[in-house]
Amino acid sequence: MAPKTPDASEIFHALAGNWTLVRDLGEVGQFTGDVTFHAADPDQPNVLRYREEGFLTRPDGKRFDGYREYDFVLHKDPAAIELLFRDPLSFGNRYVLLQFGEEGDAGESGLCARDIHPCGEDFYHHCMIWNGPDHFETKIKITGPKKDHLLHSIYRRAYHPERRDILS
């Protein structure tokens, strides 16, 4: 019997907790850091706050600290996870709406969700690949007159002694 394919709700609830992040930014460098998904408000169980913090290391060796925040909102109809910006310029605006259900591209395992975010004249082709409760990836291909590069992020569950249930 084939294993059950997780739905958006199962993926959403599995995100809660701490993760490590490695993001390849191509010629720009690499971002490494930590990510936390936590309940933003006890009265809104369908919202997880995402916060990443870490360092961008450029090819010339210079390092810069940085962070980013989103709200991940679980929707039931259609079953999806919506990412909302939290930065001051775009606060509350939709980044992408992820509906899981397709297989990953050739050479990828996992369940994939895709959406496109327009940003001025550029487009962010977002793909989230769910490999299980301890590992997921995002691939964001940015195209347009101002940008043309790929952001590949790998998320792995961070080890915490009090959460032995999430270890594999």
Per-range role (PLM):
Residues 2-168:
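Soluble ligand-binding/transfer domains with enclosed cavities or grooves
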